[in-house]
């Protein structure tokens, strides 16, 4: 079992010494330091921590905001750590302690995951409601059709089809129109 510290500051002019001090007080085997915004997922040192992680290792952070700012990213990170049979511990957020089967931590993580899912569902619901309202007001018409009525390639494909001298595959290859789109257009034209 190794104690792995992860320190992150948002920029090069911020001082990580407080985090170093707090982690060194409990004794770390190795400390990874990152100087990059927590909002970005592209964090080289965090990826090294996860790649080097072994069974029974514990990742220590002084504060959850040091490892991630997004609840969804936190859950993905926790799943990744658990998959490797390792743990995550936050010194400030003492409720998060995956180093043992702590039922309170498990409960809080489950509740937070539920709240996170609810938030995503509410966003989708509001988006659908907004689209419906915009449709009623004539402001939203959905995705623009790729092949509008004056599309030269589609019109040429229909003309070639009606001439009957080529196969559908040949027509589609020449005009760069998909088979499904051509058949859909032919169905519209014939009705």
Curated annotation (Swiss-Prot):
Keywords: DNA integration, DNA recombination, DNA-binding, Plasmid, Transposable element
Domain Resolvase/invertase-type recombinase catalytic: 2-138
DNA-binding region: 168-187
A single GO molecular function term of this UniProt record: DNA binding
Active site positions: 10
Function: Resolvase catalyzes the resolution (a site-specific recombination) of the cointegrated replicon to yield the final transposition products.
Name of protein: Transposon Tn1546 resolvase
Origin species: Enterococcus faecium
Organismal lineage: Bacteria, Bacillati, Bacillota, Bacilli, Lactobacillales
